[in-house]
Amino acid sequence: MRLAYRSAAIIDGITILGGAEFINRTKESLTLLHSLPTFEIVRAHLAVIRQAKRSGVKAWLAKPTFNVGKPTWSHSAVWYAGAIAHDAYHAKLYCDAKKNCRGIDPDPESWTGAAAEKKCLQFQRQVLSQLDAGDKIIAYVEKCQENPTYQGRNQGWGSWLDYLKRWW
């Protein structure tokens, strides 16, 4: 089932697609990120932020797209800002890896494997610290770094099946 977009907006060159509540929360989170030195990574590697049933980034698209599930975007604006940064970093890792692949898709491990997830969580933690997210949120991200395989498989049909199980 595809969500019908009732609204669209462009913030700092990033297209936002979704309902009015989603767009407002996304604007709020992007505004928080805008003041940070790390925002350029977000702006350079995400072209679209789209309301969806579950969260994940499609870094391989011509316009890299962060699909965002309601549990993520309806959480606090600070948490959502951290999630945007996290998935933008996956897109950055994909882009960096693709530069070395002469036009073919890079190995999924380079941008979605456990080592890549640790890098994205570290970037998310950095952003959340810059936003004074609080000890509880920072501790949660640090806990995720201990076992960065929670997102499931990253290759083949199993990857898609694991994505469909996401609640976030």
Language-model-detected regions and their locations in the chain:
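Surface-exposed patches in mature extracellular/periplasmic domains of secreted proteins
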Residues: 39-46, 101, 132-142
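Auxiliary, metal-adjacent structural segments of Zn-dependent hydrolase domains
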Residues: 2-64, 73
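Short pre-active-site segment immediately N-terminal to the catalytic Zn-binding motif
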Residues: 67-83
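Long, well-structured alpha-helical subdomains associated
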Residues: 130-168
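Alpha-helix boundary/N-cap detector
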Residues: 17-24, 115, 155, 159
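Active-site recognition of the HExxH zinc-binding catalytic motif
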Residues: 82-95
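Post-HEXXH active-site segment of zinc metalloproteases
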Residues: 77-79, 94-126
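Sec-exported extracytoplasmic/periplasmic mature domains
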Residues: 34-38, 93-97, 125-133
